[in-house]
A protein has these predicted regions:
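Active-site-adjacent mobile loop/cap segments within catalytic or ligand-binding domains
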Residues: 273-326
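N-terminal Sec-pathway targeting helices
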Residues: 1-15
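Catalytic-core regions of hydrolytic enzymes
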Residues: 134-217
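Active-site-adjacent substrate-binding region
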Residues: 251-279
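Short glycine-rich His-centered loop
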Residues: 117-137
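N-terminal, intrinsically disordered, polar/charged segments of Gram-positive cell-envelope systems
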Residues: 24-112
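Solvent-exposed loop/turn segments at secondary-structure junctions
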Residues: 126-129, 167-170, 206-211, 233-237, ...
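A short, glycine/acidic-enriched catalytic loop
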Residues: 210-248
Length: 326
C-alpha cells in the first residue's frame, strides 16, 4: 500500500511538473510572439518615410531568386507576393492584375540607335541625396546619379538620352514633396512635346530606410546600391475592400506592370543580388504618361553616392537588354 502511495505521489509530482513546464513554454511563446510583434511595429515606425515621398521597404532575405522560367509557373498572388512583389498594405492587388505569361510575351524593344532621343530620365524628387552627399552639390543627389546613367547610355551604348534636371520638389527655397507629381507632370509633358521621339521614361529616385539598413551588394568588385522597380496599381485597400481610383486613371497600367516584371527578372538573371522585389502601391505616380514608363529606386539614404552611381552600370545593361531591338 505504501509503495502504491509513493507511486501515486511521484506520478502526481510528475504531472504537476509537466503542467508547470507546459505553462512556462506557453508563456515563453506568448512573450516571443509579443516581442516579434513589437519589433515589427518598431521597425515599421522606424521605417517611416524619412525625407522621401515614396515608401520604405526593408528587403527580406529570400534565398530563392525568381527567374523567367520559375515566374511562368507562378499563378497565385501568394506565390507572386513571396518571390516577385512586395504589396503595400494600402494597395489592393488582385490576381487578375498580373498575368505573368502575358506580361513576358509583351515586346518592349525599340531601335535605340536612332539619332533622335528615345529615353527621358527625370526626377520627381530631385532633392533626394545620400549619406555622404555634400550640401549643395547636385552631383551628389539623385540628379547626379541620373546624369551618370545618361552618360553610360550615351557613351557606352550610343543611345541618345534627354536628362531633365527640373526641381519639382523644391519651391520657395524649401524641399516640398507634397504635390511634386502634380508639379512634374506639365513640365514633363512639355519635354515630350519637344521630343516626340521619346518612348521610354525613367523616373529615378532613392528610397528612405532606417539608419541600420544598408541596401548594398557587390557587382564586379564594386559596392553597388540595390535597386527597386516600383508600380502604382491605382486601387486602394479600404479595410479589405478594393477601392478604385478613377480620378487617377492609368491607361498603361498593364504595360507598366509587364515592363517592371521583365526588368526585374532580367536583373535577377544578369545580376542576382541587385534587385529588391517590385514594390506595389496605390496611385499612379509618373507611370501614366507612356507605356514604357518606369519608376526606379536606387539605394536609399544610407547608401553612398559611389554605391548609387555604381548601380547605374548594371541598370543600363538591364535596360538595354529589355528595350533594345538590335
Amino acid at each position: 500500500m505504501k509503495k502504491k502511495k509513493k507511486w501515486l505521489r511521484a506520478a502526481f509530482i510528475s504531472v504537476c511538473l509537466l503542467i508547470v513546464m507546459a505553462r512556462a513554454f506557453n508563456n515563453y511563446m506568448k512573450v516571443d510572439e509579443h516581442e516579434e510583434t513589437n519589433n515589427e511595429e518598431t521597425q515599421a515606425k522606424a521605417s517611416a518615410q524619412k525625407d522621401t515621398g515614396l515608401p520604405v521597404l526593408v528587403p527580406d532575405e529570400e534565398v530563392f531568386i525568381a527567374d523567367f522560367e520559375s515566374a511562368k509557373r507562378m499563378t497565385t498572388l501568394e506565390q507572386l507576393g513571396k518571390y516577385i512583389y512586395s504589396i503595400d498594405e494600402t494597395a489592393y492587388m488582385m490576381e487578375s492584375d498580373v498575368n505573368v505569361r502575358e506580361f513576358l510575351e509583351k515586346d518592349f524593344r525599340l531601335d535605340l540607335t536612332e539619332t533622335k532621343p528615345k529615353i527621358l530620365i527625370f526626377h520627381t524628387h530631385s532633392q533626394e541625396d545620400f549619406i555622404d552627399s555634400r550640401p549643395g552639390e547636385t552631383a551628389d543627389t539623385i540628379v547626379g546619379v541620373g546624369n551618370h546613367l545618361a552618360e553610360i547610355l550615351v557613351n557606352d551604348y550610343g543611345i541618345p538620352v534627354v536628362h531633365d534636371v527640373g526641381q519639382y520638389d523644391y519651391r520657395d527655397g524649401q524641399v516640398v514633396r507634397s504635390g511634386s507629381y502634380q508639379v512634374m507632370e506639365p513640365a514633363v509633358k512639355k519635354i515630350l512635346e519637344k521630343y516626340p521621339s521619346i518612348e521610354i521614361m525613367i523616373d529615378l529616385h532613392r528610397d528612405g530606410v532606417p539608419d541600420n539598413v544598408h541596401l548594398v551588394t557587390e557587382i564586379e568588385g564594386r559596392p553597388t546600391a540595390k535597386i527597386m522597380f516600383f508600380n502604382g496599381i491605382t486601387r486602394l485597400n479600404d479595410n479589405g475592400v478594393p477601392l478604385d481610383m478613377p480620378e487617377l486613371e492609368n491607361p498603361y497600367l498593364r504595360d507598366n506592370l509587364a515592363l517592371s516584371l521583365q526588368l526585374f527578372l532580367t536583373s535577377n538573371e544578369l545580376y542576382p543580388t541587385l534587385a529588391r522585389k517590385i514594390y506595389i502601391r496605390p496611385y499612379r505616380y509618373s507611370l501614366h504618361l507612356k507605356p514604357r514608363s518606369m519608376l526606379v529606386e536606387v539605394g536609399a539614404n544610407t547608401n553612398t553616392v559611389e554605391e548609387a552611381k555604381n548601380a547605374m552600370i548594371p541598370l543600363a545593361d538591364i535596360l538595354v537588354t529589355v528595350l533594345k531591338a538590335y
